[in-house]
């Protein structure tokens, strides 16, 4: 089981690490921190890693947060590798040091969250 992260989040939250890969040139960035967020419809990737992978942002969308604040986000196409599974797709960019894995990926996995003990795992 993996520990929740209490350094970035209060209260502590489930944080995973992933690998991001540019599908065109094969460049990879490893150990990217990603919040596991069952309340998020979509997955968001930290913009700094997309830049390091030489990815070109394409379409722009308006996003709404849980409190209905609106923001604009561009997308990139890449491979996100999480727990040995590769998810190919178009992902939103976020300007922070961690990303968010939303239900567009989480719904393909069998996860267990143990909030009391601040642990999570894939079954």
Task: State where each predicted segment sits.
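Pepsin/retropepsin-fold aspartyl endopeptidases
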Residues: 1-123
């Amino acid at each position: 089981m993996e520990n929740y992260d209490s350094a970035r989040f209060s209260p502590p939250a489930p944080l995973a690490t992933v690998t991001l890969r540019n599908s065109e040139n094969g460049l990879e960035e490893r150990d990217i921190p990603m919040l596991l967020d069952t309340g998020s419809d979509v997955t968001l990737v930290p913009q700094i890693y997309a830049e390091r992978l030489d990815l070109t942002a394409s379409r722009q969308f308006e996003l709404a947060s849980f409190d209905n604040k609106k923001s604009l986000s561009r997308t990139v196409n890449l491979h996100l590798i999480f727990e040995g599974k590769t998810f190919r797709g178009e992902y939103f960019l976020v300007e922070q040091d961690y990303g968010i894995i939303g239900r567009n990926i989480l719904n393909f996995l069998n996860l267990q969250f143990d909030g009391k003990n601040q642990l999570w795992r894939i079954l």
